[in-house]
Amino acid sequence: PKLKTKPTRTYIHIPPAVNRFNFLLSTIDRYSGKGSTLVIVPDNRSVQRLVAQLPEAVVLDSALERSERYRNFLTCRYGRGLTVVGTRSAVFAPIADLESIIVLDEGSEQHYEVRSPGWNVRDVAILRAMKSDLNLTFVGYSPSSEVARLIESKWIDFSSIRSRVEVSAFPQSHGELIPSRLMGEI
């Protein structure tokens, strides 16, 4: 029998100066080769931006035509080693060899289903990861209060990446609020 390592549960804090999609690609690469990875993003525009950089990804999104959505559903069901990108309903996708779930901006209001019974991606992803021993990674600029509580209780590991922001200072020449040299830069 195959020995499985203990799944990881992580929140990765990215600074605002870092492009979240480029960072997400590096996170996806870290899990590739270890089974399928499900990436859940808040909206269709985020799906399109990510898929533009991951052409081999399978898309699960309500914006697709019915036939394409069903074809992608079957690919998820029977395919192996996939990267699946979708919006909130993708959290329920029956992916054959799912190993990891990555959720971008878990506190976004677009991850919440308002119709009854109300649910959100974060809670479903946590339950699914616990039930199936999956790696669970949340990526964002700031954790929600629910995830912050899980970080505080040590159920989710917190990691932060370093970033450098280049700052230029322009002295005032005539006592103005915004230096005239800066206005020329804009």
Walk through the language-model features, giving the residues of each.
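Conserved interdomain linker/interface between the two RecA-like ATPase lobes of SF2 helicase motors
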Residues: 1-26, 135-186
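Pre-Walker A (Motif I) flank of P-loop NTPase domains
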Residues: 5-14, 33-37, 81-82
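Conserved nucleotide-binding/hydrolysis micro-motifs of P-loop NTPases
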Residues: 17-18, 43-47, 64-66, 90-92, ...
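Helical mechanochemical/support elements of P-loop NTPase systems and associated helical scaffolds
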Residues: 20, 24, 43-50, 68-69, ...
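Conserved RecA-like ASCE P-loop NTPase motor core of nucleic-acid helicases/translocases
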Residues: 35-43, 60
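Conserved motor-coupling elements within RecA-like helicase/translocase cores
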Residues: 49-97
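Flexible beta-alpha connector loops of hexameric P-loop NTPases
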Residues: 58-66, 108-118, 171-176
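SF2 helicase catalytic motif II
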Residues: 79-83, 88-137
